Amino acid sequence: MHLRIKICGVTRPEDAELAARLGADAIGLNFFSQSPRYLTEEKAVEVVHAIPPLVAPVGVFVDPTADQLNFWGTRLALRTFQLHSFDPTVLGPTFGAMCWSSILAQAVNEPDDLEKIRTLVREWRTSTREVPDPAVLVDARVAGKHGGTGQTVPWELLAGFDAGVPLILAGGLTAENVADAVRQVRPYAVDVAGGVESAPGIKDAEKLVRFIDAARSAAAGLP
């Protein structure tokens, strides 16, 4: 099984370089101002310039306006957008021309949340016909938080679940539990922020190595 790995909440160029060198497929850049991993324009430019070719920078946004997406997409040449708590009807035609791929976030804590994923995908397809189908990032629900909570999703709910689009598993993943998560859920990708950090936004080299090795090894043993 081929597993993609996204290292999210990167705030330093050296961490972007290290994650890419170790085999990360994508680097998440957080533009939610209330996040401890929030990037200013100056710092975001530095991080993006450190990401090598064929590794995707991903802009992470919470309830964004079309103007915000257009600004950051243009400023950083972003083509992949991760959207939390957003209204697809406000995205506008410029976003459709700019966006090559999108990731929609959905919290999952109970069985009824699986239907919310299907609804999210249907609404996206209806409202953004000019944009390709999204992936869905699944995270744990914690009141007032948009990711980075350290809480795990009930993996057993996602075992065998098919949303009709790629599934990205987030939520409390670490080097110690990612192998079990991959074997149970078999996601398209895994996403980690706090599980590979020494402090918010500061990636830990040893944790990165162990996480990526554990995730890749687990996926390699699956058909």
Which residues are covered by each model-predicted region?
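Extreme N-terminal starter segment of soluble prokaryotic enzymes
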Residues: 2-5
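Glycine-rich phosphate-binding active-site loops on the catalytic face of alpha/beta enzymes
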Residues: 24-35, 82-87, 141-142, 184-208
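A short, Lys/Arg-enriched amphipathic alpha-helix followed by its capping loop at the start of a domain
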Residues: 18-24, 51
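A C-terminal functional module that forms or caps the active site or interfaces directly
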Residues: 164-184, 197
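C-terminal helical cap(s) of enzyme catalytic domains, especially alpha/beta-barrels
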Residues: 41-51, 93-95, 193-223
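Structural motif
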Residues: 22-23, 75-76, 131, 184-185
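Conserved, mostly hydrophobic/aromatic
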Residues: 19, 81, 136, 154, ...
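Conserved anion-binding
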Residues: 31-35, 43, 48-169
